[in-house]
Amino acid sequence: MFLVDDFASFRPATFADIPRIAEIHIAGWETAYRGLIDDAALSERTLEKRVELWNEVLGGGDRFQNHSVHVAEVSGDIVGFAQSGPSDDPDVDPSTTINVFALYLDPEVRGQGVGRTLLDHVLDEASSAGKELATLYVLVGNDDAAVFYEKVGWESEPDVVKECLGDGYEAPQSRWRRALR
């Protein structure tokens, strides 16, 4: 079990981090989405498929141009990650808007401040790079995530909904936004 005091460090992810990122990604989906999406969507997210995905992300594949991935470490162990990149929403300017595509933690560190500080780290870097707005999507019904994002200063945009959850699965997600400047 991880106990997080006030110290978590953040750094860009490397290819060596991919197996742990994939494990956390799968655990995050299990924790956050069980009961909200079809069980088949969860069971098809194998470690092998997640490793393949994260190799593509870190390799800057076509879908992931200009994306960045940061990991959170506690005592040298990766306990979370965040993926961000230019927004592809047609109603925002991608040159000034960053989208947080993923924020997942090892379930053992949830509620200990790591997610908040990792998200702050990503948003601080985006602001320093000239971004003015951040967006992200929350699966409709994921009340824990909605409460978290509201608590850390995000505003819900319930009228902006996407149906794509990834890997060909569709589920409604509502957009959230936060000004960076």
Ranges and model annotations:
Residues 93, 102-120, 129, 140-147, ...:
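Conserved glycine-rich acetyl-CoA-binding loop
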Residues 136-146, 162-168:
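Conserved beta-strand-loop-alpha-helix junction that forms the acyl-donor binding cleft
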Residues 21, 25:
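Hydrophobic pocket/interface hotspot
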Residues 3-8, 12-16, 26-35, 41-108, ...:
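Acetyl-CoA-dependent GNAT
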Residues 67, 170-175:
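Short hydrophobic/aromatic beta-strand or adjacent loop that forms the aromatic wall/cage
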Residues 126-138:
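Conserved GNAT acetyl-CoA-binding A-motif
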Residues 152-159:
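A secondary-structure capping/hinge motif
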